[in-house]
Design a protein with these regions (language model features):
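The feature captures the beta-strand-to-loop junction immediately N-terminal to the Walker
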Residues: 47-49
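Helix-to-loop junction immediately C-terminal to a conserved catalytic motif
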Residues: 62
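Conserved ABC ATPase "signature" region
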Residues: 122-140
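Catalytic Walker B motif of ABC-type/P-loop ATPase nucleotide-binding domains
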Residues: 169-173
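Conserved ABC ATPase signature
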Residues: 144-148
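Conserved ABC transporter NBD signature motif
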Residues: 66-79, 86
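Hydrophobic anchor residue at the start of the ABC signature
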Residues: 158
Length: 233
């Protein structure tokens, strides 16, 4: 049975906007022209059947794949940015954790994030140390990333992406390999930073249990369109 869409809170204004955005895969139309602004300081769920184009949409918002229509952040479109500058605006957590690591060990990866975070006033060394501790990563710091379990790699990837501090954060199945306790820990870190930094967060998760109650709205991808789910409360 199709799960009931979560009731949404009133949407806040935002800076990442798309107008008449459409997507194709080969000759197949995935998304008909669509307009939306992602609200800042709120967490959204992007839901839909397998293969409908959810991951494709996130990649398009990062300008990693072609799209049709207009995409902008605070009125500036990606062609006006250096590609590196757009990457400092929109962060993406991929489904495959190992595709996203730059270093050999846990300690080196997190040190790289600490040096390069775009939100150093929030992601202080003390806050990053706390996040490492609650995720159980502190005791793994000397370890090779490639000796970690799938769940440990995903927690490291999650913290690395989160602590980079981009104002827009897109998460593709961030909790797929985690138990419920770890999911709740990640959600607490995500909510705290989202509210403090007024981050616009959109995540894909096939698992809804223990997740939807933390989210502010749901964006449903079906029939080649996107629509807000549920009733406003």
């Amino acid at each position: 049975a199709t799960p009931a869409p979560l009731d949404r809170r009133p949407l806040k204004p935002g800076k990442l906007t798309w107008k008449q955005l459409s997507l194709t895969r080969g000759e197949n139309l995935l998304l008909k022209p669509h307009d939306l602004t992602l609200p800042q300081g709120q967490l959204g769920l992007l839901s839909g059947a397998n293969g409908v184009g959810k991951s494709t949409l996130l990649q398009a918002l990062c300008t990693l794949i072609p799209y049709q229509g207009k995409l902008s952040y605070a009125g500036q479109r990606p062609p006006h940015f250096f590609k590196q500058r757009w990457a400092k605006t929109v962060g993406l957590m991929l489904q495959e954790a190992t595709a996203q690591f730059s270093c050999a060990t846990v300690q080196e990866e997190l040190a790289l994030v600490s040096r390069n975070t775009l939100a150093p006033h929030y992601w202080t060394k003390e806050r990053l140390a706390h996040a490492k501790q609650v995720l159980g990563l502190d005791e793994l710091e000397p370890r090779s990333i490639y000796q970690l379990s799938g769940g440990q790699q995903q927690k490291l990837q999650f913290l690395s992406v989160l602590a980079m501090g981009q104002p827009v954060l897109l998460l593709d199945e961030p909790f797929a390999n985690l138990d419920q306790a770890s999911i709740q820990t990640c959600l607490t870190l995500l909510k705290d930073s989202c509210q403090a930094e007024q981050t616009a967060v959109l995540l894909i998760s096939h698992q809804r249990v223990g997740i939807t109650e933390h989210l502010d709205y749901e964006l449903i991808f079906e029939d080649q369109t996107l629509k807000l789910g549920g009733n406003e409360n």
